[in-house]
Amino acid sequence: SNCTDSGTDFQTYEYYNGGGDLNQNAGNNSPLQYVCASSAYARDATGDGIQIAVVDTGINASHSEIDDNMVSALSGSDTINDDDNPVDDEGHGSHVAGIIASERSGAASSGSTHGVAYEADIYAIKIFNSSGNTTNAAKAAGYALIEATAAIDIINNSWGTDADCTSESNCRSTIGTAFFDNWEDVSQLSTPKISVWAAGNEGDAEPSAQCQTMLYNTDISAVSVCVVAVSTSENGDDNSQGKGKIATFSDKCGSVAAFCIAAPGDDIWSLSHSGSSHTIKSGTSMAAPMVSGGLALIMQEFSSLTPAQVVSRLLSTASDDSEYSQSSIYGHGMMNLNAATTAVANLQTINGSNLLDDPNTSYKDLVNNSFTSSAAFSNAINSALEGKVMEVYDSFDRANFEVNINDFFSSSSYVSQNTIENHMARLVPKNKQKVKHKNLYGNFSFKVDENFIQSTLFQSAGDFLTLGYNQSTNSFENAADPLSGFFNDNAFGNKYLVNPYFYTGSGQDYFMSFNGNDTYGFDTFINGNTSDLGLAFNFNPLSSTNGDKKYAGDLQIVLGTNYEQNKFLNSSSTGVFSTGDMSNTNFTGLKYKKNITDGLTFVGSGFAGYTYIDKAKNSYISDSTPLLTSSFTVGLAKSKFIKENQT
């Protein structure tokens, strides 16, 4: 089977009853299962919103299994009797309409069934009288009424002319000049209407004249389908040459193979024109509404497709292997609604000023679109995008599909690198030795803070200024190797306890402070990937130079900004999620450090920042409000917890 297992919930009693066996064991005979209808239902394709005209003997509009899907009769919709009451007094039209759109009620009673597009809307156009006869005038009037009714999307024609035609003019005269012209007109509308035709029931090698007309008029053939009938019964049953094979009565696709498809049409259980009863009928008249219903599912599922593209998708996705490879019999093969409602080729994102109508629109395969968020805000972005979808497009015909946005997003781990989310915790006033060198080019001093194993190289620029260079090599704040197993989501067991801004990478920066007062200073930093640049101002209101506050601890207030190239908050992205050349984050924070004992230090910090995203041209990331991020750290540090040169 070419069907998926995803639609098993839809394989109900009603679903199987279309095969006429009236029990769930008839699954192998179910015409709906033959065309994989349940797979389309699992993708929410039901025909909802699609409007189908049934040009036939009228419809039993009060039947309990289709009454809710019937559109009020159009004025003049009984063209054979020239009135407004297209009641079915023959039975053919009701049966056809039920195959398309009888309702899915969930009933398990004997006889209950449902149509292919069980939520589609149905118009009754009556062109045949109670004896099954019609006129060219009635046929032409029916199509004229359809042309004037903009809402109609699909026209089902379970009838035809048993004749051959060999040119456009010959076909025009064969099927009726006025009718041909009206058929051509509805095919040339700005939004053309799709016409579905029964191939005929003479067992001929060529289908009806209406099907043959498709060979000679490209406007008509672009939005028309010819349908042959297969049997779902075993060989030996009436009309069957073997399960799934062409029915004995059915005309074949012949020269019209390019516009032809197969569907079940033998022993089909559907609605009767009497009360709310049911009956079995066979014919290409029963196969055509299977296809009309299938087209409704495709049209509903892919709102981006034109009617011609809907027809093309139906034909291109038909099952054409094995028996159905014989195009002169089956045309494109057996209708397959599973294949028709899935991607035919690569799915792609799309961007441009007018999307599908823009000749400069660019398409990117899904694998070329990604967004990897830094650990700093992965939790927030995953939560914000949960349940959100975006449209992508099949490169085959630009059919629109919905995918979860989260499928494109991933999160990086807390890695050992010098990044924006780590700098917020790292930006503290440097340890400064009071030196008396007056010469800007005087001697350099060096100091190691054993609490944090952080080296500082600095030089005096007089009594007034200290210039410095800091190199973090193996400190508590960047001890990636010995602490990597501790400072991560898994070790904590709760991702919200991990400080996203905790610095775990080595780095370097330059700083400037004022010798006479180590309460404040400036600090610059360049990240490890060299594409970021930042500046921070540090202020310490509890400076140890103030005797009254000597034992209050070390409190730093940090104000800073950071610029990132082609990313924000250290994320990385490609394709339609790309960002502009320069995003920046303005941040502020507090960091407090106090020696509790000679060997133990309390460390705490809290930071918040606003990130302004630079937009890239044609990116899906646009018009975003500034992102607010925040974090905190609380911990104890032991003196000489990590030794110098530790690996």
Put a short name on every predicted segment:
Residues 3, 38-75, 82-136, 150-153, ...:
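Subtilisin-like serine protease catalytic core
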Residues 46-48, 91, 103-108, 124-221, ...:
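Substrate-binding/access-modulating region of protease and related hydrolase catalytic domains
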Residues 444, 455-459, 500-502, 512-514, ...:
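Residues on the lipid-exposed face of transmembrane beta-strands in outer-membrane beta-barrel proteins
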Residues 471-475, 504-506, 516-520, 559-565, ...:
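Transmembrane beta-strands of outer-membrane beta-barrel pores
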Residues 56, 213-296, 300:
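Extracellular S/T/G-rich loop segment that most often corresponds to the catalytic His/Ser-adjacent loop
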Residues 463-466, 508-511, 520, 543-558, ...:
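Repeated loop/turn-to-beta-strand initiation elements of outer-membrane beta-barrel proteins
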Residues 29, 152-156, 223-226, 300-414:
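C-terminal subdomain of the subtilisin-like protease fold in secreted/lumenal serine endopeptidases
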Residues 1-49, 64-65:
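Protease zymogen maturation seam
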